[in-house]
């Protein structure tokens, strides 16, 4: 199976605007909402969303969350893990936290993020925004509140989100794991 392009740059842009306006509808002026990107794959998506939101709201609190050592599988590898930066320069106490990650697959990264976020306070609510929801691959009962598209895929397939900042183009591909 050759890689199948699921989304091109124009489609991704349209989805990002839709997701941003859904956030605006639900969170008004963002005074009680913080946006947190899950390291590393959620950063570019979150920054793109923030860029759109900043056209109307300039004081949105934005942070980065590393979940490396909160994952339930981090001890199952021989290689040394490298943690990413967690940067939360604000309180999440009694705020609505919108977690952002590129692909929701098994739900394990989100479970780890929920554990990690508790170290920083008790949010009023936690919501999830994903560009891609691989909905039939879930191992945990986790669903996105905001979703770009649903992708039905097999276990031997992988979804890759490409960003122009890292990969030279905005696109999403579906391919077999070995490709």
What are the language-model segments listed below?
Residues 1-31:
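Active-site-facing substrate-recognition patch
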Residues 29-39:
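Short glycine-rich phosphate-binding loop at a beta-alpha junction
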Residues 32, 61, 96, 125-128:
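Residues at the starts of beta-strands that form the adenosine-phosphate
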Residues 54, 88-90, 150-151:
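Short secondary-structure boundary/capping segments
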Residues 59-96:
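Short, glycine/charge-rich flexible loops or terminal/linker lids adjacent to PRPP-binding catalytic cores
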Residues 88-120:
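Internal catalytic-core helix/loop-beta-alpha segment
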Residues 115-179:
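PRPP-dependent phosphoribosyltransferase catalytic core
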């Amino acid at each position: 199976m050759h890689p199948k392009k699921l989304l091109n740059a124009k489609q991704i842009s349209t989805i990002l605007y839709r997701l941003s306006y859904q956030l605006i509808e639900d969170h008004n002026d963002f005074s009680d909402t913080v946006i947190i990107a899950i390291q590393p794959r959620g950063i570019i998506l979150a920054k793109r969303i923030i860029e759109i939101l900043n056209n109307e709201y300039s004081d949105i609190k934005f942070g980065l969350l590393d979940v490396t050592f909160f994952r339930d599988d981090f001890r199952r590898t021989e290689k040394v893990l490298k943690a990413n930066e967690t940067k939360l320069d604000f309180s999440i106490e009694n705020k609505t936290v919108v977690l952002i990650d590129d692909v929701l697959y098994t739900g394990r990264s989100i479970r780890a993020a929920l554990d990690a976020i508790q170290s920083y306070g008790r949010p009023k609510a936690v919501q999830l925004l994903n560009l891609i929801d691989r909905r039939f691959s879930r191992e945990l009962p986790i669903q996105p509140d905001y979703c770009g598209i649903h992708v039905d895929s097999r276990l031997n397939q992988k979804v890759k989100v490409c960003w122009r900042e890292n990969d030279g183009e905005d696109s999403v591909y579906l391919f077999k794991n070995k490709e």
